[in-house]
Structures are given as C-alpha cells and as structure tokens.
C-alpha cells in the first residue's frame, strides 16, 4: 500500500486541477471522485461522461486504478481525460492510497 501523504501531494500536483474528492464536491473538467472505490466507470451523478467511460463496465478499486492511472487512454480508449498517466508504480500506489482515504471521508 502507498503513502497517503505522498499521494496527497501527487493529487494536488497532477489531479486537483480537474478533480475534487470531498463529499458534495463539484465537478470540474473531471468528475468529483468521492465514492470512487466500488463504483462502476462513468457513474458519478451529474457528470457528462463519454460513452467509452460509461460502457467500460469495470468497478474502480486498487487494481483497476493501478492499471488505469498508468495510461488512461489505453485503458479506456475514448475517455476525455487528457492526462498522460503516471508511469512510476510507487507514485500510483501513493495516489491510490490517498484516493482511498480522501474519497471515502
């Protein structure tokens, strides 16, 4: 499992421009991520997803996020997330540890 504090820094640097994590947080360019773990792709209420996201049909968890965050456009071709990905597995683990905590508070 990753380091939550390191993950928070990664989130602020690479994700917070487009995403919020708190309950009731607003959608920005990307969806609010609260309740992410255990939710299927393309299901955050009130966010306009591409068909690719809605139809992917996987449930978000540590393993699916580890793969997705390495190369989002490869994992979900047609996603509108314009993020290249995080190549370092340790950084992805830290980010996932943070997301697991922050999206569930």
UniProtKB/Swiss-Prot annotation:
<keyword id="KW-0496">Mitochondrion</keyword>
<feature type="modified residue" description="Phosphotyrosine">
    <location>
        <position position="98"/>
    </location>
</feature>
<comment type="function">
    <text>Electron carrier protein. The oxidized form of the cytochrome c heme group can accept an electron from the heme group of the cytochrome c1 subunit of cytochrome reductase. Cytochrome c then transfers this electron to the cytochrome oxidase complex, the final protein carrier in the mitochondrial electron-transport chain.</text>
</comment>
<keyword id="KW-0597">Phosphoprotein</keyword>
<feature type="modified residue" description="N6-acetyllysine">
    <location>
        <position position="100"/>
    </location>
</feature>
<feature type="modified residue" description="N6-succinyllysine">
    <location>
        <position position="56"/>
    </location>
</feature>
<dbReference type="Pfam" id="PF00034">
    <property type="entry name" value="Cytochrom_C"/>
</dbReference>
<dbReference type="InterPro" id="IPR002327">
    <property type="entry name" value="Cyt_c_1A/1B"/>
</dbReference>
<comment type="similarity">
    <text>Belongs to the cytochrome c family.</text>
</comment>
<keyword id="KW-0479">Metal-binding</keyword>
<keyword id="KW-0007">Acetylation</keyword>
<keyword id="KW-0679">Respiratory chain</keyword>
<comment type="function">
    <text>Plays a role in apoptosis. Suppression of the anti-apoptotic members or activation of the pro-apoptotic members of the Bcl-2 family leads to altered mitochondrial membrane permeability resulting in release of cytochrome c into the cytosol. Binding of cytochrome c to Apaf-1 triggers the activation of caspase-9, which then accelerates apoptosis by activating other caspases.</text>
</comment>
<keyword id="KW-0813">Transport</keyword>
<feature type="modified residue" description="N-acetylglycine">
    <location>
        <position position="2"/>
    </location>
</feature>
<feature type="binding site" description="covalent">
    <location>
        <position position="15"/>
    </location>
    <ligand>
        <name>heme c</name>
    </ligand>
</feature>
<protein>
    <recommendedName>
        <fullName>Cytochrome c</fullName>
    </recommendedName>
</protein>
<dbReference type="GO" id="GO:0006915">
    <property type="term" value="P:apoptotic process"/>
</dbReference>
<feature type="modified residue" description="Phosphotyrosine">
    <location>
        <position position="49"/>
    </location>
</feature>
<feature type="binding site" description="covalent">
    <location>
        <position position="18"/>
    </location>
    <ligand>
        <name>heme c</name>
    </ligand>
</feature>
<feature type="modified residue" description="N6-acetyllysine; alternate">
    <location>
        <position position="73"/>
    </location>
</feature>
<dbReference type="GO" id="GO:0009055">
    <property type="term" value="F:electron transfer activity"/>
</dbReference>
<dbReference type="GO" id="GO:0005758">
    <property type="term" value="C:mitochondrial intermembrane space"/>
</dbReference>
<dbReference type="GO" id="GO:0020037">
    <property type="term" value="F:heme binding"/>
</dbReference>
<dbReference type="InterPro" id="IPR009056">
    <property type="entry name" value="Cyt_c-like_dom"/>
</dbReference>
<keyword id="KW-0249">Electron transport</keyword>
<feature type="modified residue" description="N6-succinyllysine; alternate">
    <location>
        <position position="73"/>
    </location>
</feature>
<feature type="binding site" description="axial binding residue">
    <location>
        <position position="19"/>
    </location>
    <ligand>
        <name>heme c</name>
    </ligand>
</feature>
<dbReference type="InterPro" id="IPR036909">
    <property type="entry name" value="Cyt_c-like_dom_sf"/>
</dbReference>
<dbReference type="GO" id="GO:0046872">
    <property type="term" value="F:metal ion binding"/>
</dbReference>
<feature type="binding site" description="axial binding residue">
    <location>
        <position position="81"/>
    </location>
    <ligand>
        <name>heme c</name>
    </ligand>
</feature>
<keyword id="KW-0408">Iron</keyword>
<keyword id="KW-0053">Apoptosis</keyword>
<keyword id="KW-0349">Heme</keyword>
